[in-house]
From Swiss-Prot:
Disulfide bond sites: none
Organism name: Phenylobacterium zucineum (strain HLK1)
Keywords linked to the UniProt accession: Aminoacyl-tRNA synthetase, ATP-binding, Cytoplasm, Ligase, Nucleotide-binding, Protein biosynthesis
Gene coding for it: gltX
Protein name: Glutamate--tRNA ligase
Class of enzymatic activity (EC top level): ligase
Motif 'KMSKS' region mapped to chain: 238-242
Catalytic activity: tRNA(Glu) + L-glutamate + ATP = L-glutamyl-tRNA(Glu) + AMP + diphosphate
Amino acid sequence: MPDRPVRTRIAPSPTGMMHIGTARTALFNWLYARHTGGKFLLRIEDTDRERSTDEAVKVIFDGLKWLGLDADEPPVFQFARADRHREAAETLLARGGAYRDYMTPEELEAEREVARAEGRVVRSPWRDASPNDAPDRPFVVRLKAPQEGETVIQDAVKGEVRFQNKQLDDLILLRTDGTPTYNLAVVVDDHDMGVTHVIRGDDHLNNAARQTLIYQGLGWEVPVWAHLPLIHGPDGAKLSKRHGAQAVSEFDSMGYLPETMRNYLAKLGWGHGDDEIFSDEQAIAWFDINDVVSAPARLDWAKLNHLNNHYIRQAEPARLAELVKTVLASRDWPLEAGDMAVIERTIPFVRDGAKTTLELADNVVFALKRRPLELPEKTRTQMTEELRGRLSRLREALAAVEYWDVPSLEAALRAFAEAEGVGLGKFGPQLRAVLSGGAPAPDLAGAMVALTRDESLGRLDDALSPSA
């Protein structure tokens, strides 16, 4: 382990979406930096100029901000450092760790055919040629990888991983136009940013061997490698569109809270005993990259929904009201003055069963409906004179309730049912429909407290009017 303060990084490419796997990688880097008192850094690998638009970069910034993963230093943009990457390639050339390869495309294809037939990697005849023999034609710069022995990776997650050097080709460092390739740029940037721990998906494990050789060729300290298991779908297959959401923005729009995602993503490959729910502070105190398991993690929607319900029940109603407002706006639901107060007042009564803020929005709609409410057809057919009389007497009993709170209203409903000599089932469903207009609603007492005395009695009056 490097004898210096921990510096981790997340280095996404701006592709237009922030994948949930990238989010998990960012979280693990952030947690380990916070756990060790180190720094968490951000680099944008924007060398693909066609895809690296300002909008695509903003998606990354927005995703990290939503997740609450704050970088400790300004972001580094890889494309702007191309000169530094070329400088490192020149250093490797000067040290004999790289060479200029003048093979034409036709020669390269012929060598590939021979290498394939012989079961070996491609080797350029220019690997050991004298620079004095160089022709006047385009060239690439290749790493001069060792051809014998092994390159050994000590990985914090995978353990010791060995690569046979004879199976490692002389990877290209600079293309014919002088632009750097991924593996060179990553090594140079990580070194210059002082990155001590490279924590990333295990689809990069093979790159670790190649990058180790570049580090060694430049005489730089190799960082600690930690390659995280991939995230699979519930069926054990690699996560794909058929499993549902993949992007951070999709989980946001589906009504999941960022604290839910931090808690849930932390459990994908890491855990602390039997603890399923833990705060950011607990995760930071407990997290160690050496405790991450190497087996793929499976996305479990039931667990995610359970967690989200927990955090919805813990969140401040005012914050949830703003989230519900956003959901309703996306549905073109018109909000009027005073509606935010109604939403905030209603949330404590309807959130216990809500798995997402979308469901929470569904559950508050009853309180936002404008009078007079349209009763469900079933309720209208049930409004006999007998039921109207009973609801009218109930209205008077409710109007006499001194304290408009859940215990008082529950007591009033029980007393009324007893006085009428019937069970609550004889009028409760119809009262619920009168109060909610058929929309999802909480228990009767909770619904009436959310609506307030005046609104509840007003909705009863509307239902009992001759024109109803």
